[in-house]
Amino acid sequence: MQGKCWFLENKALKPFVCFYGGDQFLYIGDRIVSYFSTNDLYVALRGRIDKDLSLSRKVELYNGECVYLFCEHPAVGIVNTDFKLEIH
């Protein structure tokens, strides 16, 4: 299936891809792609680079949606760096 991801980083041999989705499905463009198991879930990048990126991390958000991170190597952690701390 061809589609566009939410985010693609393609810096010198360290590509990774992020998709939005939910429990057992991903949004690819305007399509919903469901899956049964995350064990064999991967993204095949074809074009300027030819790489298969496996699912490294699935992050569940507070609203029930998920962010899926695909990359070549395991992700140690994901940190939210866009927050504001207000002290009253």
Swiss-Prot record:
Cite the CoV 3a-like viroporin CD domain residue spans from the record.
1-75
Q: Between which residues do disulfide bridges form?
A: none
InterPro entries attached to this UniProt entry: a/bCoV_VIROPORIN_3A-like_CD (IPR046446), Coronavirus_Orf3a/b (IPR004293)
Q: Which Pfam families match?
A: Corona_NS3b
Judging by the UniProt lineage, the source's domain of life is Viruses
- Give the family from UniProt: Belongs to the coronaviruses NS4b protein family.
Name it.
Answer: Non-structural protein 4b
Q: Give the source species.
A: Human coronavirus 229E (HCoV-229E)
The taxonomy runs: Viruses, Riboviria, Orthornavirae, Pisuviricota, Pisoniviricetes
